[in-house]
Amino acid sequence: MDGMRIDFHTHTTRGSADSNMDPFAMIDQAQKIGLEGLCITEHDNAWDDTKIDDYAREHGVTIFRGIEVTTEWGHVGAFGLKQYIGGIYKVKQLRKVIDDVGGFLIANHPFRYKLDPRFQFIHKTPAIDANDPVSGYQALEVLQYIDEIEVINGACSEQENLYAHAVAQHLGKKGVGGSDSHSHPSVGCAVTVLERTVSTVQELVGELRAGRYAPGQGLHVGQMRMFP
């Protein structure tokens, strides 16, 4: 699929304490592998740095800002917010706030560690049948409030990603891809390919709502292909 390739999920040292990726190094890596867009989705934080924007433009990369919101039901990628708003750790409130601004919500890595019984003790969700996507949807209440599902995440196992894709298909969703990079070598390992070029978050949301996109993988090693 030809189009604009965007990594929907990255973290930098400017806004995520668990990241060791300098944003300038991230942009250099994006240019090197032919990635046209980067969504910077810091943890519970939206920052604005025009120097980053200018540097990205000079290198042929477009920056889109989002927030990875930590909610009571897991991480949710939020697009359309200019700053963190109190109370959005509750998914229902986050949904209301996003609707008010015409934004978009993505369930990030929704099945990470949830398919392995050894990790069941750390989750409050019911057990999930790895062979039945319906059970995954029923187990995660957050999926009732989001617009899309991250079906390929660079830090998830193949099983987790394929299961997320199966659940997305069950719900009639295409799924998106993001590397979840915290260091620059993994930038672009999972991407979302848009049919049309966009330059603002508003345009990005418009393309998502129009369904003109598909998840992809392997760009970081020069083996770009669609997922799965």
What is the role of each PLM region?
Residues H43, H109-P110, G178-S181:
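Short, well-ordered beta-to-alpha junction loops that form the rim of enzyme active sites
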Residues E36-D44:
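Active-site beta-strand/loop signature of hydrolases that rely on acidic residues for catalysis
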Residues C39-I40, I106-A107, E150:
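Conserved beta-strand positions in the central sheet of alpha/beta enzyme cores
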Residues G102, I106-L115:
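Internal, conserved structured core segments that host functional sites
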Residues M1-T12, S16, N20-Q29, L35, ...:
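Charged catalytic cores and adjacent phosphate/nucleic-acid-binding surfaces used
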Residues C39, T62-F64:
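Short, conserved beta-strand segments within well-ordered enzyme catalytic domains
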